[in-house]
Regions:
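Exported/periplasmic ABC-transporter solute-binding proteins
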Residues: 20-58, 63, 67-68, 72, ...
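Bacterial N-terminal signal peptides
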Residues: 8-18
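Periplasmic-binding protein-like
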Residues: 84-89
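Bacterial N-terminal signal peptides that target proteins for export
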Residues: 1-9
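Secreted glycan hydrolases and related glycan-binding modules that recognize and/or cleave
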Residues: 3, 14-15, 28-30
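A short, gly/pro- and small-residue-rich
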Residues: 101-108
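Short, glycine-/small- and polar/acidic-enriched structural segments
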Residues: 110, 117
Length: 271
């Protein structure tokens, strides 16, 4: 009898203890945030990082994740099936490539900002490059983006315009290209090599010379008649898992608030 009462008492105590213990969830609570993946040209890095934070602040529960690279690399990644919600390219050609992959809908991409080219040198300018004719001097080292990269193609267009003008000679383009020692996969790599003094000069966008970068390089402006006004298109990816949110983000890029950020970083606002 004693052992029976003891057993009953022990069972009762265990039951009470179990009832008082906090109930633990079987699994952790799911993360309620939504991640929006934006593929964007490397030249948009600084401006889009700020715009992304502003968009998150205006849309609680949304996290914007960027994939910055050369537009040609991003178009290739889209063609290979990389998950994405938005694509912002530095030219229409790579947007067309993305459309041809079937990931984008033709006619939905629109220009949201513009840019222009500038020649840069290291801050101490060891080669003493002062003007466009100096780019053709023998023995200097230049860094361009690869021709597949929008800014690389724009640089070639600039050289063609100079040759067509005729005043710097029919062989100007050939002389300049003979000085190119490296072709980079995005514009940020060109900027970095020149800023580090690994090259005497290069061609980037004016937007790449932000306050920080401007302390590390000098600029040589390219006259309007030789320059290229680069048009940047943006569109939602057709198979986005968050298509409504992707369209909301692309629409936000056209708002005055977002356009002001782009202008702050050296871009040309759309009119």
């Amino acid at each position: 009898m004693f052992y029976r009462l003891t057993s009953l008492l022990l069972c009762g105590l265990l039951f009470v203890a179990a009832g008082c213990a906090p109930i633990q969830p079987a699994t952790p609570a799911a993360d309620s945030s939504t991640t929006l993946t934006v593929f964007a040209a490397a030249s948009l890095t600084d401006a889009f990082n700020e715009i992304g934070k502003n968009f998150e602040a205006a849309n609680p529960g949304v996290k914007v994740v960027f994939n910055f690279a050369g537009s040609q690399q991003l178009a290739q990644q889209l063609g290979q099936g990389a998950p994405a919600d938005v694509f912002a390219s530095a030219n229409g050609k790579q947007m067309d490539v993305a459309i041809d992959t079937g990931r984008m809908i033709s006619g939905t991409a629109h220009t949201f900002v513009r840019n222009r080219l500038v020649v840069i040198t290291p801050k101490d300018n060891p080669a003493q490059l002062k003007s466009l004719p100096d780019l053709a001097k023998s023995g200097i080292k230049l860094v361009f983006a690869a021709k597949e990269v929008p800014v690389g193609q724009y640089a070639l267009d600039f050289l063609d315009k100079v040759v067509k003008d005729g005043r710097l000679g029919a062989d100007y383009k050939d002389k300049v290209l003979a000085n190119v020692v490296s072709n980079e996969q995005d514009v940020k790599a060109v900027l970095a090599k020149v800023a580090l003094g690994e090259a005497d000069g290069g061609i980037v966008y004016t937007s790449d010379i932000t306050a920080a970068a401007g302390t590390k390089v000098q600029r040589i402006d390219i006259p309007d008649k030789f320059n290229t006004i680069a048009a940047y298109p943006i569109a939602a990816v057709k198979d986005s898992k968050h298509l409504d949110l992707a369209n909301t983000f692309t629409a936000y890029i056209f708002t005055p608030a977002a356009q002001q950020v782009l202008v702050k970083y050296g871009f040309i606002a759309i009119k």
